């Protein structure tokens, strides 16, 4: 008997090993004993040729879980076995006309919010100016969000305008001795006390500096905010250091981050726009435009396009599992867990993470494929024959809602770590250390969201609810896979995905 997934974690320096897939009982799908190297001991994954997937020794053998469709998403149909090549000039002309209808879909999403200054969160997007709007700087007069450095202090637009009008028009307000409290909702009730508050906090007509906060002033204020937080809770410095570590690991593990994907979708990148696939003709043209890393949808003309693309998605899924496992190894405490528990956490967590990160590649109109080289429209995916046309719609519905939370990569880095360290997975041997790690991650996530999204007080609770939503998406995906298992006799599942599905639930 060959080694198991657990053996893969024992010696990270050893060579990739072979896993023996034994014949199953008569109640299950019969499988020929096949040795297939697919999960190296460094917790990565070596590639498997597509030809191996055609071997029916790897036919569907799944428990209730899900295959994955990461960034090379697609499952087209149209009963198409080989396609004749269209005339390139005619095809290009038709594509350009049709593209005008779809090009706007790539630029409708707002850019993902920028990261915090390194002074505050210990990490930031390289060479990118952090936005004042995300710094949680309050107006010194009323406590509303400051829009900048106005008349010598950080002030909101309302108080800036009020002070300017008072000074320019030389307004004199009726005296009030009540020392009224000035805050966002009451600032217009007593103009005298509001003006006195402006003067008290240091607003002056001699300091007529408008607009953005000077960099030195900004860094000073951010350092003060960070220091205040650390004094209130000494553990927060450790939590922010953990957030920085996870973010750094995330950037190293996942080549196509949300920031990069959003730049492509919003047209903010200097690279050429992705090739839009909206029908079968444009899919054929994509053969020449897109550099497919593993498999082109048209490389095997003897198979239906839907099946060929589905197999390509499986290759991307294997890559995604490799990226996630490498990231998991960098979560503090993960590699010290029981070896079997490490495997269990990954088996159950990878798909939920894949769908989380898939949302970064989506907008309401389509999804980026092939590392951002292509953009496949939602309508095209929905038009595919059943059951393939049903696969992606739940993911789009989730993505639209999830993207509305406006998380950035620094938020996602902690969130996916929380998903991995879920102590309620079936079959765990030692739950306590897993829950201890997750508790620490949850504290880091809560602090991160307070710093990065000060205006969204319920964001932490909303994000935890998404973990439940992800499990439901996985369940629905499995139900579709069970349909394919029965109806698509030519379909096969990648051996690594078989190993992940085996003995789940």
Curated annotation (Swiss-Prot):
Tissue: Highest expression in adipose tissue. Lower in spleen and lung. Also detected in ovary, mammary gland and small intestine.
Pfam families, per database record: Hormone_recep, PPARgamma_N, zf-C4
PROSITE patterns referenced in this protein's UniProt entry, alphabetically: NR_LBD, NUCLEAR_REC_DBD_1, NUCLEAR_REC_DBD_2
Segments of this protein annotated with the region Interaction with FAM120B: 205-280
Keyword Amino-acid biosynthesis found: no
DNA-binding residues: 136-210
GO CC, alphabetical: cytoplasm; nucleus
Positions where Phosphoserine occurs in the chain: 112
Claim: Phosphoprotein is one of the keywords in the record: yes
Entry comment on modification after translation: Phosphorylated at basal conditions and dephosphorylated when treated with the ligand. May be dephosphorylated by PPP5C. The phosphorylated form may be inactive and dephosphorylation induces adipogenic activity.
GO BP, sorted A to Z: cell differentiation; cell fate commitment; cellular response to insulin stimulus; epithelial cell differentiation; fatty acid metabolic process; hormone-mediated signaling pathway; intracellular receptor signaling pathway; negative regulation of cholesterol storage
Keywords: Activator, Biological rhythms, Cytoplasm, DNA-binding, Isopeptide bond, Metal-binding, Nucleus, Phosphoprotein, Receptor, Transcription, Transcription regulation, Ubl conjugation, Zinc, Zinc-finger
Binding partners and assembly: Interacts with FOXO1 (acetylated form). Heterodimer with other nuclear receptors, such as RXRA. The heterodimer with the retinoic acid receptor RXRA is called adipocyte-specific transcription factor ARF6. Interacts with NCOA6 coactivator, leading to a strong increase in transcription of target genes. Interacts with coactivator PPARBP, leading to a mild increase in transcription of target genes. Interacts with NOCA7 in a ligand-inducible manner. Interacts with NCOA1 and NCOA2 LXXLL motifs. Interacts with ASXL1, ASXL2, DNTTIP2, FAM120B, MAP2K1/MEK1, NR0B2, PDPK1, PRDM16, PRMT2 and TGFB1I1.
Protein role: Nuclear receptor that binds peroxisome proliferators such as hypolipidemic drugs and fatty acids. Once activated by a ligand, the nuclear receptor binds to DNA specific PPAR response elements (PPRE) and modulates the transcription of its target genes, such as acyl-CoA oxidase. It therefore controls the peroxisomal beta-oxidation pathway of fatty acids. Key regulator of adipocyte differentiation and glucose homeostasis. ARF6 acts as a key regulator of the tissue-specific adipocyte P2 (aP2) enhancer.
Protein family membership: Belongs to the nuclear hormone receptor family. NR1 subfamily.
The protein's name: Peroxisome proliferator-activated receptor gamma
Source species: Bos taurus (Bovine)
């Amino acid at each position: 008997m060959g080694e198991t997934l657990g053996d893969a974690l024992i010696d990270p320096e050893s060579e990739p090993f072979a896993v023996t897939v034994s014949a199953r009982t008569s109640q299950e799908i019969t499988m020929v004993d096949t040795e297939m190297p697919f999960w190296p001991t460094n917790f990565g994954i070596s590639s498997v040729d597509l030809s191996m997937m055609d071997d029916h020794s790897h036919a569907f053998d799944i428990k209730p879980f899900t295959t994955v469709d990461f960034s090379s998403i697609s499952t087209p149909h149209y009963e198409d076995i080989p396609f004749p090549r269209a005339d390139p000039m005619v095809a290009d002309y038709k594509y350009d006309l049709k593209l005008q209808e779809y090009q706007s879909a790539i630029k409708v999403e707002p850019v993902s919010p920028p990261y915090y200054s390194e002074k505050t969160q210990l990490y930031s997007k390289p060479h990118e100016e952090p936005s004042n709007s995300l710094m949680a700087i309050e107006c010194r007069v009323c406590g509303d969000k400051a829009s900048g450095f106005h008349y010598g202090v950080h002030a909101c637009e309302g108080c800036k305008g009020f002070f300017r009008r008072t000074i320019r028009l030389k307004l004199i307000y009726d005296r009030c001795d009540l020392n009224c409290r000035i805050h966002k909702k009451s600032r217009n009730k007593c103009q005298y006390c509001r003006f006195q508050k402006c003067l008290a906090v240091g607003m002056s007509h001699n300091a007529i500096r408008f607009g953005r906060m000077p960099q030195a002033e900004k860094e000073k204020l951010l350092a003060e905010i960070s220091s205040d937080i650390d004094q209130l809770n000494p553990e927060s410095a450790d939590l922010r250091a953990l957030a920085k570590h996870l973010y750094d690991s995330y950037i190293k593990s996942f080549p196509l981050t949300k920031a990069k994907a959003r730049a492509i979708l919003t047209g903010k990148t200097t690279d050429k726009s992705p090739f839009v696939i909206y029908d079968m003709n444009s899919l054929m043209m994509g053969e020449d435009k897109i550099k497919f890393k593993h498999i082109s949808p048209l490389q095997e003309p003897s198979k239906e396009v839907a099946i060929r693309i589905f197999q390509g998605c499986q290759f991307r899924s294997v890559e995604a599992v490799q990226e996630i496992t490498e990231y998991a190894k960098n979560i503090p405490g993960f590699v010290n867990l029981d070896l079997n528990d490490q495997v269990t956490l990954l088996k159950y967590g990878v798909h939920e993470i894949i769908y989380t990160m898939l949302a970064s590649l989506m907008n309401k109109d389509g999804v980026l494929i092939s590392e951002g080289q292509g953009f496949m429209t939602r309508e095209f995916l929905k038009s595919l024959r059943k059951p393939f046309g049903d696969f992606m719609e739940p993911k789009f519905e989730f993505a639209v809602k999830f993207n509305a939370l406006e998380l950035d990569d620094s938020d996602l880095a902690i969130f996916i770590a929380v998903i991995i360290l879920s102590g309620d997975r079936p079959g765990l041997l030692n739950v306590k250390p897993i829950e201890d790690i997750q508790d620490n991650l949850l504290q880091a996530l809560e602090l991160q969201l307070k710093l990065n999204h000060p205006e969204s007080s319920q964001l932490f609770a909303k994000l935890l609810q998404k973990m439940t939503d992800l499990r439901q998406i996985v369940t629905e995906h499995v139900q579709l896979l069970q349909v394919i298992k029965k109806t698509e006799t030519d379909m096969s599942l990648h051996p690594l995905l078989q190993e992940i599905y085996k003995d789940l639930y």
